[in-house]
Amino acid sequence: MQRGRRKPDWLKSRPPSGSRFTEIKERLRERDLHTVCEEANCPNMGECWSGRDGPGTATFMLMGDRCSRGCNFCDVETGGMKSLDSDEPENVADAVAEIGLDYVVLTSVDRDDLADGGSEHFAETIREIQRRDPEILVETLIPDFQGDPEAIDRIIDAGPDVIAHNVETVERLQWPVRDRRADYEQSLAVLDRVGRESDIHTKTSLMLGVGEYDHEVYRTLGDLSEVGVDVVTFGQYLQPSRSHLDVFEYVHPDVFETWRAVAEREFDFLYCASGPMVRSSYKAGELFVEALLREGRSPEDARRHARAAGGD
């Protein structure tokens, strides 16, 4: 393990700044909205919010800033959940419209304390955004809803453009990386149901550097391919604090490029965003989906567009 070791140069990033970044942050504070970008201390926050190649993207975190689960990689606090804010769906939709986003990502904390896992609240937020502007592309990064098919179907029925659910790591490392209530097969089942019950694009993400072996990553890609996942992302795990899971290793950028090639060429995923600083909602994946859906490009053209704009 690499406790105490300096981060390599390729993991250094500039603090977020710029007028666009400041504007978005102020709008979010005015409406008391949360973003996973801030809660998870995402290293790409400034780049995505500032919209270097467009109007910018923010990932809104629904249903509060405290989670019913305690994953050892995640910086979101556990316990002490509050009642849902019934105004949140409208507030998020208004903020999206005011900021001028073309592509918005919605995610949430886990709310195992709620009968439906918060799925109706999630779905209503999607619908409110679509009411404001049907042209806005909506990606949802959903929890597993404890495997409840009705909860998953509520998200499908709301009609987002992408449904993502993260397996996070290989099967062997689900614990200690994820909360014990998370399960590899259950996560695959969520993705499989979306693929079987709809034509909505599916997406998932894996962290590298938590102790996985290459053959386990390869097998995971195979499992994801079998359930019809369209887009996969790889990023470096970074320890949020010393009380979180240790970083096992800092994976070289060349390794990320290798996994990108394997995902796209061997397993035929539509797109793979892969790099040390890539996160699940990293804009390269969003640029790909936007090019594919909005502009009707072929997967090959959409890949080139996303890499050129995303700097991959």
UniProtKB/Swiss-Prot annotation:
Checking PANTHER family in the record gives: LIPOYL SYNTHASE (PTHR10949), LIPOYL SYNTHASE, MITOCHONDRIAL (PTHR10949:SF0)
Q: Does the keyword S-adenosyl-L-methionine apply?
A: yes
Pfam families given in the database record? LIAS_N (PF16881), Radical_SAM (PF04055)
A molecular function GO annotation: 4 iron, 4 sulfur cluster binding
For this entry, the protein name equals Lipoyl synthase
The catalysed reaction is: [[Fe-S] cluster scaffold protein carrying a second [4Fe-4S](2+) cluster] + N(6)-octanoyl-L-lysyl-[protein] + 2 oxidized [2Fe-2S]-[ferredoxin] + 2 S-adenosyl-L-methionine + 4 H(+) = [[Fe-S] cluster scaffold protein] + N(6)-[(R)-dihydrolipoyl]-L-lysyl-[protein] + 4 Fe(3+) + 2 hydrogen sulfide + 2 5'-deoxyadenosine + 2 L-methionine + 2 reduced [2Fe-2S]-[ferredoxin]
**SMART domains (UniProt xref):** Elp3
Q: In which pathway does it act?
A: Protein modification; protein lipoylation via endogenous pathway; protein N(6)-(lipoyl)lysine from octanoyl-[acyl-carrier-protein]: step 2/2
User: What residue stretches are annotated with the Radical SAM core domain?
Assistant: 52-270
Residues engaged in binding [4Fe-4S] cluster 1: C37, C42, C48, S281
